[in-house]
Amino acid sequence: QCVAHCALMKTIGLGAGIIGISTAWHLRDRGHEVVVVDRQPDAALETSFANAAQISVSYCEPWANREAPLKALKWMFDKEAPLLFRPQLDWDQWRWGLKFLAQCNDTAFERNVQQIVALGAYSHAALKDLVASTGIEYNRLERGIAHFYTDQKSFDAAGHAVELMRKFGVQRRLVSRDELLKIEPAFKAYGDKITGGTYTSTDESGDARVFTQELARRCAARGAQFLYGHDVLRLNKIGDAIDSVAVIARNTGAGGQKDFILKADAFVVACGSYSAPLLRTVGVDLPIYPGKGYSATFPLLKPEGAPMVSTIDDGKKIAMSRLGNVLRVAGTIELGGFDMSLDSPVARARCHMLSRRIAEILPGVCDTRTPEEGGNPQYWTGLRPATPTNIPFIGQTRVGKLWVNAGHGTLGWTHGAGSGKAMAELLSGEVPAMNFGFLGVQAPRAVRGTVTA
């Protein structure tokens, strides 16, 4: 709760994914007035809709490492590659790529991992507190996360990664093939191909969409206002601060409807990949670029044979999580702009790869038939808001009254609860208790209701 030094504010949150809703919850919990704007008819209908479902504090290494540049070049012409760079005539893409390359060294990798792990641990604790206080059910499984390898070279490299992550307090351990199959017997049919693996018992999984929507309902019940189905037209800047935001309802009908203005003491941009272009309109330039990810949700034919431990398949860099009577499988990143199509040749190849791989790993367990084969897999794509470091931007921008909570990449679900809590603390004039480089903490701009350092 806010204490005496923290004056209550009216805040407007732009975006109703896991980051935006978590922010709204924690702001409301502290007594701040909250209005959330989102273009969709409900919460969590874009990037938070059908992700890999993992709360992956322990498996959080940045994409940028010393091997990434050569791998990216090798994969450029492979439609099924884990990381596919699709060059565009887009200066933002190339600028982002150059910044990414600058992070592809051991020093930057360790520096980035340290912050990502710190935010992950803080966020996991915040999620547990949220679940305990709200009782939200979201197909949560606290069985840890396993990661299996199918070649000796990758398994050997995993041992080095285990040692590195232990430096930062991550209790990941190397396991033999036999031990891995004891942890998750569902992979026995594929066991001959598995070299070994790693395992962390503290990680978990659950449905991000269900959780986010339930948390949004509880926010509304506690007085938060929601403007669903509304587009953000522009941020209105007067002097060196944001004065208001202009929004308009999407279903305006033939007669049309004029936009209207919302004023507040603070504006929080949590629009995922769309945060960067919106922020640039008022002179805030953050390197957030969309990474197109894919998922498939398969009905279970043999529930007793489906994995209960959320697992990463290193061979294809995909993750799978049991969500009740379905298996969610997700992975691959495609850097090619804001394209959301599922019917392009590349998109179809990547979706069909998910079907083929699960049929290979878990034969007969799921209905993995493609639509062309008469099946009904729920293929989906979402844009992961990627930064070159994999570290999100959380805090106050150099424009007055304008805050940002975006750039979480593939870890939005993992970092969601803590990012929202941290944002509420920052807006209330406090510094969250973790080793993380928040925006504007050293000299935050004076805003009504906050304390300057």
Where do the protein language model's features map onto the residues?
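N-terminal Rossmann-like FAD-binding beta1-loop-alpha1 element of flavoenzymes
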Residues: 9-36
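Glycine-rich FAD pyrophosphate-binding loop
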Residues: 29-49
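Central helical "cap/lid" subdomain
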Residues: 40-46, 237, 243, 247-307, ...
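Dinucleotide-binding Rossmann-like beta1-alpha1 core, especially the glycine-rich loop
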Residues: 50-177
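Active-site lid/adjacent beta-loop-alpha segment flanking the redox-cofactor pocket in flavoenzymes
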Residues: 109-112, 129, 133-137, 284-289, ...
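Short beta-strand to alpha-helix junction loop
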Residues: 111-124, 147-157, 198-218, 227, ...
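Helical element adjacent to the flavin cofactor pocket in flavoenzyme catalytic cores
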Residues: 156-168, 187-265
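C-terminal catalytic lobe of FAD-dependent flavoproteins
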Residues: 172, 202, 314-315, 339, ...
